[in-house]
Amino acid sequence: MSKKVGFLQGNEAAAHGALYAGCKFFAGYPITPSTEVSEVLSIELPKVGGKFIQMEDEIGAMAALLGGALAGQKALTSTSGPGLSLKQELIGYGCIAEIPCVVYNVMRGGPSTGMPTGPSQSDVMCARW
């Protein structure tokens, strides 16, 4: 019996997990180290009838995410530390309005550009509260 084994990065696995969970809408802005989520979903979402939008910035991505969710879609965006900071006002709006959506935050090491290509746990308190 032969088994097919594949290897994925964590971001690629998260993108495929979102698809399996029924995600049909992604709005994002490419930012390291979360870019692979956008790369995978830009290819795979159209295959399942979903919509992929690359926005002009992180604020626009969060606004589009909330719009997609309000339109009834399972919606996702991905970001990293500085992008999460830019999204705060609209994250607050989404929380107070109880708009169901997913913000996938791939944390960077350091403040914002200390180690921009690697993951860390620097945004835990921001993501938690």
Annotate each predicted stretch with a short phrase:
Residues 1-127:
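Thiamine diphosphate
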